[in-house]
Amino acid sequence: MLEKIRRADGLILGSPVYLGDISAGLRALYERLVFQYITYKTEVRSYNERKIPVVLIVTSNVPAEYDAELLNRYKGTLEAFVGPVQTLASGNTLQVSSYERYNWTMFNAEEKKARRESVFPGERQAAFRLGANMIKE
């Protein structure tokens, strides 16, 4: 997979945020993707001679602004070793269709459903535009 990514014109990464971080699967890919380019030299940090654009998208149950620090941390490293990064966070997501079924009383199911209907379509469109713009560049 790493060789296919090296030959690609761009890379789109996406993950839910679990316990304040990206999923274990994406974290494993991220580590292998970055580690292959580390030089351990002060004068040249990366062996990557062909940078590609990256889009990093996360979803979570908390408001999107809570994911800003997480995204910035990954963005900085990806930009240093893979290429320029654009990010998008979709927060306060609808986890299940029926919160009552699970007795999850800490969530306001109606607010989450309303957000999914009013805000999420715009976020989906924004994600689409990020990918479309990457292709144009």
What residue ranges belong to the model's regions?
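Helix-loop-strand module that forms the ligand-binding subsite of alpha/beta enzymes
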Residues: 1-81
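Glycine-rich phosphate/pyrophosphate-binding loop and the adjoining helix
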Residues: 75-137
